[in-house]
Structures are given as C-alpha cells and as structure tokens.
Amino acid sequence: MSDLSHIRNFSIIAHIDHGKSTLADRFIQICGGLSEREMEAQVLDSMDLERERGITIKAHSVTLHYKAQDGKTYQLNFIDTPGHVDFTYEVSRSLAACEGALLVVDAGQGVEAQSVANCYTAIEQGLEVMPVLNKMDLPQAEPERVKDEIEHIIGIDAGDAVLCSAKSGMGVPDVLEHLVRVIPPPQGEIEAPLQALIIDSWFDNYLGVVSLVRVKHGRVKKGDKILVKSTGKVHQVDSVGVFTPKHTEMPDLKAGEVGFIIAGIKDIHGAPVGDTLTLSSTPNVDMLPGFQRIKPQVYAGLFPVSSDDFEDFREALQKLTLNDAALQYEPESSDALGFGFRIGFLGMLHMEIIQERLEREYDLDLITTAPTVVYEVLLKNGDTICVDNPSKLPDLASIAEMREPIVRANILVPQEHLGNVINLCIEKRGVQRDMQFLSSQVQISYDLPMNEVVLDFFDRLKSVSRGYASLDYSFDRFQVANLVKLDVLINGDKVDALALIVHRDKAHQKGRALTEKMKELIPRQMFDVAIQAAIGGQVVARTTVKALRKNVLAKCYGGDVTRKRKLLEKQKAGKKRMKQVGSVEIPQEAFLAVLKVDS
C-alpha cells in the first residue's frame, strides 16, 4: 500500500445554525488558506442565496495543510455539507468521499433530529464520527447534558468530545489535533490504475463541466485521457487542482486526495455525479459504489411568464440539473399557463431555492403552481400508475383505490412544548408510533401523510414549539386513503393549474377556504366572476367577485320609478353580454393561494 498517512478526509455534520460554516472559517484561518484581507464570514457559502439565508445548500470542498504538534504536516481535505432536511442527499454524497466526520452540536441547544439522521448515514457508511461541542462561549452552554444526549440519542461515546467555540476561536486547535489522531487515513494505491468518484459537478460557461472528485486509486494529471464509465466517452484533462478555498491548480491528484478535474466537457450530462472516472488506457476498472439516486418528493409546475423565455428556461434547467443531482423535470403544458416544466424537488425549501436561483442566475420570470406529492393510483383494470399532477388524475369512475405516501417523522422537542407538537401532528392526520423521554427532550416518531408534511409542517412545527423542535423525515410507504380531486372553476371553466388532491374529510373546508382566498386575489372585473370549488360534478363551495358598476341613476333626480328600472335593466343586459365574452386574468398570487390555505 502507498503511504497516505498524512491525508485526512472529513466532513462536518451539524444541524442548521449549529455553526459548521463558522468552524470551517476557523480551520481555514488557522491553516492559512486565505490572507486576512480575503477572509470573510462563511467563506464556503459562495452562493448569494446561501449567504442571505444563512444556510449551506451545496457541498463545498477545501484542501488545507495543517502542521500538527507532532511536527508532521497533514493534508486535510474538508468537505462542507448542508444541514437542512431537504438536502440530505448532498450529505450522503459528501460522506462517500470521507473516512471520518465531525459531529458538531450546539452546546446550548443539544442534539437535533437532523444531525441524528446524518450521523446514522455516516455510521452506516463506516465513517469514524468525532463529536465536537460548539458555542461553548454562550452562557447557556451545558456540555455535560449535551454529552449525555449524544450518548443516548445517537449512541456514540462522547466522553472525550472536544469543547470549542468557533466564533471566538477557543478550542479550535484542539479540534484539529484530535481530528488528526482520531480520523483514519485513506486506503489506496497510487501506482494502481486510476479510479475516481465524482462527488459534485457544476457548469462553468468558460471551462465547461468542472467535477469535484475523490481519487480512490492511481493518479490523474493534466493531459491524461480520462474515460467516464457510465457514458463511455473519453475526454482530455485540461487541468486538475484543489480549492484552498481559492481555485489552485496542481501538477496531479493522487490516491486519497479530493480536488477538481476540468476536461473541457461541454455536454451537460457528460459527467454525472456519482460516476467513476478512469484512464482510457485501463477501461475495465470497476465502477465505484456511488450513492443511491434520490427520488423527488414534491412536484410543482414552473412556467415562464412570457412564452418566449421557454428555451432559455430549458437551458437554465439543464445547467442546474448538472449541479443538483436531485432535480428531475419533464415538459408540461397547461391551458391556463402555456408551456413549462413539471419539476421534482426534495421539499419546499429546495423548491424555493431552485426558483430563486433560476430567477436570479438566469434572469427568468416564473410562475409556480401549487406543489403536490406523488400518489399511487390502482385502476379498476388492475394497473397501478403514479400521479404527480392533479390534472393528470384519471376519471374517478375508473379508479379502484388511491394511495398516498406516508412518511415516518422523527421529532425532537423540549418537554414543555410536547403538547402543542402532538396537537399539530393530530391535526395533520398523524399516527403516533413511539415516544421516548430523554433528559430534557422528548423524541417522538409519527407516521404522517407526506402531503401534510411538505407544505407548511416545518414552519408550523417551529412556531408551535417556539423554534425548539427539530424534524427529520423519510418516505416509508404508500397507504390507501380516501382522496378526492378538488377542481377550481372560474366562471364555469376549470383552471387546470389550480386543481388539488385532498382528503375527502377536508375537501369542503379546503374548498371554502380556497374560494374565499381567491376572491381576495382576483381583481374585480366589469362583470361578476363566480369562483367555485368542485369535486367531480358536485360544487362544494362558491364565492363571487362582485362586478364594478357605474351608478347609472346618478342623472335621475326624483322622477318615475319605471325610468330608473329601465336604466338598471339596460345595465344588467350589458353586463350579461360582457360576461359571455369577457375573460378573467388570474394573477400569480392566486396560483400560490393554494399553499397559503391553512387546512
């Protein structure tokens, strides 16, 4: 075996706001990756969106050189991971390239559901997990309680957890020292044929596809001809290097290292994430086990406001898909909105982020329809189909049963907020599976319908628990449910983009709330606009946007009642004629009203 004992590959697992990006900044400062002038808070969160929202969305990598107390200089390859539940697959990708992970826990708040889930992923992949308690400078830090929680909830020994404060820099060198001792070096053979895993890739307008890779065996240098295993295409390497976090070219990348490869690949699908690279001279190297393809949980239609932008929109989506392996899309057309795409997302945050990235980075104006989850429908002829768009639902007469996706949700919540959280879960049709009392927190697990979870469950959970509850969920199974399709009719015409699939018990209430909401949003016309919610042929709710009308009696001072009646009848006839030919413009807010209706 080649000597790779000076290399350490690790990533940081932490819940949102537990300080992993700040800790990364401290590592970069201590190892001198950037000069004082270039240093800014959250160096690795390079997207404007990440900085504004204060969350990490994409995985980033940095190579640092750390001179340890034993006199050796270690090469630390650090891969930053996101902490939000919607980006779990980014985490599993980052972990596939590491031998160890730092579990960063806020010493004041304690363990949160998200870190638990990511920590299990790390342990399953055989990584060495090293606990670190952050935010020790806060007065409310309780290291002993949090160590107990780590041992109880996650089940790893936290006796020698390192205490630090990334903000003030206290204890950060201890973290690095500990890391070099605890995390094992990579295994690999430099002289063997090249075998490298693509962790991430993104599209650069000048360079083509830039791939972030972890080299398992062998080496790759500029001028090599590389073969992408899944496509079978050969490309010539233009440059290889690492991020320190600056883009730094290197003569070569060797086994055990993490860095980037640019090979002038112009085809967006040329280097899929999770693929294996090798040299064209050794084409029969085995594929590395990648990571499972992630299935989108939420689907929504996105349509360009002006139909001329359709091609630009398609191109923008292709570039984003390269960078975001979880995006899936297919063309869709709607009577109300024209041509667009039906896009699959991992959750609501993911959807918002993608929409914002499309609008900002590619300068598009988009309309989004209400998101839905995937339902399984068993037809009377025995076929089973998956429906991700309410307007594609077959006729009710041909459906034998409908099944909705159920998620298993794990919620960690302080005891004083337990009652509120349980009420929320019951309101969302949840079934309790398990409850465990840990020192000051309670861990409850519920089976919840996914369509109740994806829309606003996360926000509601935070508000009923004053921000202390944390949530992690994963798809469990499909279960038969009494579901119906709720259509919205405006002046008797169905608007396909507003259809919803809802539980029959909630259909009337949802229909009423939705029509009331639409009434506020649709501007008044010169004629009455009827807004109806219907299940099949049965109208369950109706409101009317009253017409704007001129006061035709203003010129009559006194006089005979028949004169007034004649003028009113004439106006009425005019309005009736108008209603037959008039069409109603539906504003963008109305399409999103569907989300805002609290069931």
From Swiss-Prot:
Span of the signal peptide:
none
Q: Where does GTP bind?
A: 17-22, 134-137
Q: State any GO CC term.
A: plasma membrane
Question: According to its UniProt record, where is this protein located?
Answer: Cell inner membrane
Q: Which Pfam family is one of those matched by this entry?
A: LepA_C
In terms of NCBIfam families, this protein maps to: lepA (TIGR01393), small_GTP (TIGR00231)
Extract the PANTHER family matched here: TRANSLATION FACTOR GUF1 HOMOLOG, CHLOROPLASTIC, TRANSLATION FACTOR GUF1-RELATED
Q: What does this protein do?
A: Required for accurate and efficient protein synthesis under certain stress conditions. May act as a fidelity factor of the translation reaction, by catalyzing a one-codon backward translocation of tRNAs on improperly translocated ribosomes. Back-translocation proceeds from a post-translocation (POST) complex to a pre-translocation (PRE) complex, thus giving elongation factor G a second chance to translocate the tRNAs correctly. Binds to ribosomes in a GTP-dependent manner.
Name of protein: Elongation factor 4
User: Could you tell me which species this protein originates from?
Assistant: Azotobacter vinelandii (strain DJ / ATCC BAA-1303)
Query: Lineage of the native species?
Result: Bacteria, Pseudomonadati, Pseudomonadota, Gammaproteobacteria, Pseudomonadales
Primary gene name: lepA
